[in-house]
Amino acid sequence: FGLLSELSGKSTSKSVREVHPIFCNESGRHWFTALNAYRHFRDHVPNTGRVWLNSDRMFTWFLRHMPFIRKDFADVRSDEYPIRLWTVAVFLFGVLPLLKKRGVGRLVIGDEFDTTVKASFKGIVHFDGLYDQSRFFDEAMSRFFMQKGWMVSQFSILRPLSEILIEKTLSQRYPELLKLQVSCHAAHKEEDRVRPCGRCEKCRRIVGMLTALDQCPQTCGYSNSQVAKSLREFVEKGIHQEAEGQRQLTYMLTKCGAINTVDDSFQTTPPHPEILSIRIDPQRSPFHSVPMELRYPLFKILLQHADGALQRKGSRWKPVNLFTDPLFEASYPFELDYGLRENGQALFG
């Protein structure tokens, strides 16, 4: 939201004038993670909307009728689903009526670099359980919307970024939004505010990234004891993140003295500084995955927080000048001509 709001404030394009933050209110505890942000946005941000969903109840009903799932699955503390039935598509279709009512033509989601994966198992190509968060899904949905005549395109402006670079940009550029972040598998209410549990894998990840970036996890509602516990369990249990991201984060935490690892491999294996750069990858984050007139101002902002920009050439990352690369002006294939052929730099000054 912070990036989109900033971009819309600078744009002279008719297609980038308003941002409509729309929250999907699940009927269960998943809603807790968004509640702090929703209350703030409802009271302070124009165009905020909310759609109520009961999809989580439906998924639970499915699980209760699967004979191979233990009956007490809801009481098992785990960072994993018994079977993943949840899908991003539920939220996307949930907001479509509001998009139609308000005349919104872009459905922007927050998927990052490591959610586009193509893998193979015994000759079977798959998406590592992340298809609904991948660029391929964005494109499939955009094609579907176009075939329906709905004039809606779907994309993410975060695909060139790692989780830690997103957190770095959030904490440095939008600290007021960082205060609203609750990324936790078991968030709970304390008086009028939702707080993270400080025990799950997501909490380890958030505490680790903020600590490595010299930011205060307490800003997101963590207590001192939760921070200490999360960092201790970061070493003991690890996190779920792309391998290079885990390596770089562990390196940064070790270097700043936040953790002590007993794994000698961390002393001999080099870090992965590319994690802190904008990464242009032909499969995961090509230039044309973002509409043309957003690229120039978006990259200008992100370069203020990233360690430069890199482009994948074969198996290596090579420095790239984002604005002079021939592919920078590649057309975005899922929008009609709204008069967006104006040069992005001219649109934003």
Predicted regions and their residues:
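Nucleotide-activated chemistry modules centered on ATP-dependent adenylation/adenylyltransferase
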Residues: 2-349
